[in-house]
Amino acid sequence: MTTALDQLKQYTTVVADTGDFQQLAQYKPQDATTNPSLILKAVQKDAYKPILEKTVRDHRDESADFIIDRLLIAFGTEILKLIPGRVSTEVDARLSFDTPRSIDKGRELIKLYEDAGIGRERILIKLASTWEGIRAAEVLQKEGIKCNMTLLFSLVQAAASAEAGAQLISPFVGRIYDWYKKQAGADWDEAKNGGANDPGVQSVRRIYTYYKTFGYNTEVMGASFRTTSQITELAGCDLLTISPDLLQKLQDSNDTVERKLSPDALHDKPTERVAIDEASFRFQLNDEAMATEKLAEGIRVFAADAVKLEKLIDSLR
């Protein structure tokens, strides 16, 4: 029998969402994604402590920020040895509202990769999908630095990212699901709100349909999954980035996976493009409580994990 994972790969580019690169080979993903939380989690494992310790030792007198950049590149370099495609490396979330510094950081990360002998075509620079992050992506893309817009929870963020020429977006599924489930409390009905009716799945489907309707080349990569059902409901999406735990569940399953998304079979096609000047962007984002709250929370969590990583580095000096 063909596994669910192998069936999914017939329709979608499968990406591994992890800093634990030793798990990559068994799932044979095309690309990989990392974020500050995943790197923090990885360096606390015995298998990866030597990478952290060596990076600190080699740059002991430099700032924690300087060392973190080298640590990100060290992980990215190891990941790229194990996959044929691209790795996503994230700009510090504390720069989410600072366009000039986000641009500078993106350039710095690319230079570090190129100094390590890795071409920029194999790197995606992850930026938060704030107005400022999207403007940074617009500049970087024109310089040939490909960007992955993360912490994306709404159509207006997706529309603005596409207009800016971003290479790829990462609309979050699980965190949207979490928000609606928490809001409903005891009234949540999993049977009614799961599967194709999952609010996170519906959000990605809407974004995918918008992009294909208006001919945007920006890739759609569903992210932040809680269940294999959320993944299989998006079979056919350009890419899906999946944690090792869920990759394993898909590999262990022989359930049939059918294509759910296709540019040739779009439903509920939009008739108008979203207005995305700065004022319209901010108003539409503000008008969507879920997107506003999850974007803010995501930035806080990633920023807090960056601080934890800095403290861990300082403790090793």
Swiss-Prot record:
One of its GO terms (biological process) is carbohydrate metabolic process. The keyword Ribonucleoprotein does not apply. It catalyses: D-sedoheptulose 7-phosphate + D-glyceraldehyde 3-phosphate = D-erythrose 4-phosphate + beta-D-fructose 6-phosphate. It is found in: Cytoplasm. GO terms for molecular function: transaldolase activity. The keyword Transmembrane does not apply. The active site is at K126 (schiff-base intermediate with substrate). SUPFAM superfamilies: Aldolase. Its EC number is 2.2.1.2. Keywords: Cytoplasm, Pentose shunt, Schiff base, Transferase. Signal peptide: none annotated. Disulfide bonds: none annotated. InterPro entries: Aldolase_TIM (IPR013785), TAL/FSA (IPR001585), Transaldolase_1 (IPR004730), Transaldolase_AS (IPR018225). Pfam families: TAL_FSA. GO terms for cellular component: cytoplasm. It comes from the Bacteria. Its main location: cytoplasm. Pathway: Carbohydrate degradation; pentose phosphate pathway; D-glyceraldehyde 3-phosphate and beta-D-fructose 6-phosphate from D-ribose 5-phosphate and D-xylulose 5-phosphate (non-oxidative stage): step 2/3. Belongs to the transaldolase family. Type 1 subfamily. Transaldolase is important for the balance of metabolites in the pentose-phosphate pathway. Homodimer. HAMAP family: Transaldolase_1. This is Transaldolase. It comes from Burkholderia ambifaria (strain ATCC BAA-244 / DSM 16087 / CCUG 44356 / LMG 19182 / AMMD) (Burkholderia cepacia (strain AMMD)). The lineage of its organism: Bacteria, Pseudomonadati, Pseudomonadota, Betaproteobacteria, Burkholderiales.
